[in-house]
Amino acid sequence: MIRTGRRLCLLGDANSVHLRRWAQQMIDRDWSVSVVTARPQAIDGVEQRVLEPVRRSADWLWRVGAARRHVASLAPDIVHAHYVSSYGYLAARCDRRPCVMTAWGSDLLVTPRQSRAMHWLTGWTLRRADLITGDSSELVELASAYAPSVPARLVHWGADTDRFAPTPWRDKPGFQIASLRSWEPNYHIDTLLEAFAQLPCSRLAPPATLHLLGGGAGEVALRRQAQALGIADRVCFHGRLDDAGMIRVLASCKVAVSVPASDATSVALLESMACGLAVVASALPANRAWLGEDPALMPSPGDAAALARALRRLCDDDALAQRLGAENRARVLRDGRRATQMDAMAALYEELLEKAGPRR
């Protein structure tokens, strides 16, 4: 049964493209959406309640009172927190049910390992959810280990396969590579630069080009590294781009690179696959789930030599790169369409409401 006038309150960073897309997808499915956030940015059609800024992890402890007041005032039918160790904690303290929590990756893969206290707090938080979602099997399994009695489901962020679509291979000039990942240590952009510098560009016409999207705090150091490696004229530092900008860059590229040390299913990965690019990705469980088990195209994080070999293989075998790109597009159409994933999430919301019954 589809209800009308349903109210969804998202707790998360309103300046995150992922949360913004989630909000829009649920508006498109006739939900009234509000956001409680410590990092505001206007979202069309969404009422927003802003918390005091958070500058260190301990600050989340002091945002509980305001979060409770905002959630109580908004009176949502469902509370959905994005990122367990921050907004998930706030949602757990708000005690508004049904409560959904979505793990983003590091909140389960990294943060709980930092201390016994964070390990305990992660479990305490997750056990107060009515449903947990994650975008990789690894995250779902971890969530179930922390909170065995709480249902955990695999829901991907998904890619907009109508907008992120292939361009004809023959229209891609030379050998161009894209990275959509942030310029932060986890994503090893420095390793990518080192590997790119090893490509035999003297025999390539036009020379290979590396496009770096995503932006981040590492820009100055990365620009210096590119200069020191002698590749600054072949590396384009685009920074953060909107969807149209990303699509424009990806249209000229044959290969995408995503080599983080830690990650769940990356939206950047899915969008690159949707555009029909061959992908070189670090040997992580979430990446293997989407790309298979070819070790030659799945270097260990931080291994510049292995990454260079993978790029050289695709550079030398254009037919292989084209075939892998086509296979990637087909895989995302089958399992990674955003609309399909958000339909599944909306159905999970409905199940929670039916189980909860009328709110008194």
Predicted regions and their residues:
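Active-site donor-binding acidic/aromatic loop of nucleotide-activated sugar
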Residues: 218-221, 232-242, 249
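Short hydrophobic beta-strand element within catalytic cores of glycosyltransferases
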Residues: 278-281
